[in-house]
């Protein structure tokens, strides 16, 4: 992993289109600004991880699931 | 074409009905062709079956059946990616994680599936706010509760 030290208001450029700036440092919290093309999706890691985990949980249901569901979800 | 499915054996599907997740789903980046399968006798749940991998299928549902006021705004990027022109073309589904007992099942409201019904382009859209949980409880009136 590439490690760079930056101060407030300094930035990093990734490729031609992406700029990551350090906007403020307040105690344990760092405010980061990200400028990137719209096609680059930016997520907080814990949210993306949670979605990944949930998807894999939802994909790993037992194959006899339908028997269990019978009669449970009729409106 | 015929495909092997996780829950309902071998079935015939209409290629016109394939749903294209061009960038896959989080955790399943390589899976980009799915098909929605109705469950006989069940008007709440559907199966979202991968066409490439028979063992991969999700149970999905209309989140509005459980959360009437569920609402969010689509950003410009997804509107462009899915080439959405009309709100009426948009179908919103939530992936359900089924539990036994059924009422302990949850639905993912933070990352709904957005499908453009017109061109069958789809994407799992991660909402940027924390307003809706990944594991939202479901509560469905059971037959007993309805007095059936």
Where are the model-predicted features located?
Chain B
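Extended catalytic/binding region for NAD+/ADP-ribose chemistry, centered on the ART fold
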Residues: 71-74
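Short active-site loop/helix that positions an aromatic residue
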Residues: 76-85
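Long, compositionally biased stretches
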Residues: 1-67, 87-93, 97-148
């Amino acid at each position: 992993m590439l490690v760079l030290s930056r101060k407030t208001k300094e930035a990093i450029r990734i490729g031609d289109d992406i700029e990551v700036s350090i906007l403020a440092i307040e105690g344990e919290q760092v405010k980061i600004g990200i400028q990137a093309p719209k096609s680059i999706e930016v997520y907080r890691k814990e949210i993306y991880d949670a979605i990944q985990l949930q998807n894999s949980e939802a994909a790993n249901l037992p194959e006899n699931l339908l028997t269990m569901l019978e009669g449970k979800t009729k409106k | 074409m015929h495909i092997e499915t996780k829950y309902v054996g071998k079935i015939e599907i209409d290629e016109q009905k394939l749903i294209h997740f061009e960038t896959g789903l989080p955790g399943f980046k390589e899976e980009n062709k799915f098909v929605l399968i109705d469950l006989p006798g069940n008007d709440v749940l559907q199966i979202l079956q991968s066409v490439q991998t028979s063992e991969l299928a999700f149970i999905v549902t209309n989140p509005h059946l459980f959360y009437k006021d569920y609402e969010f705004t689509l950003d410009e990027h997804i509107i462009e990616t899915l080439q959405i022109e009309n709100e009426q073309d948009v179908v919103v589904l939530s992936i359900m994680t089924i539990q036994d007992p059924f009422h302990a099942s949850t639905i993912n409201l933070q990352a709904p599936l957005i499908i453009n019904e017109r061109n069958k382009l789809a994407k799992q859209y991660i909402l940027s706010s924390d307003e809706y949980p990944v594991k939202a409880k479901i509560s469905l009136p059971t037959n007993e509760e309805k007095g059936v």
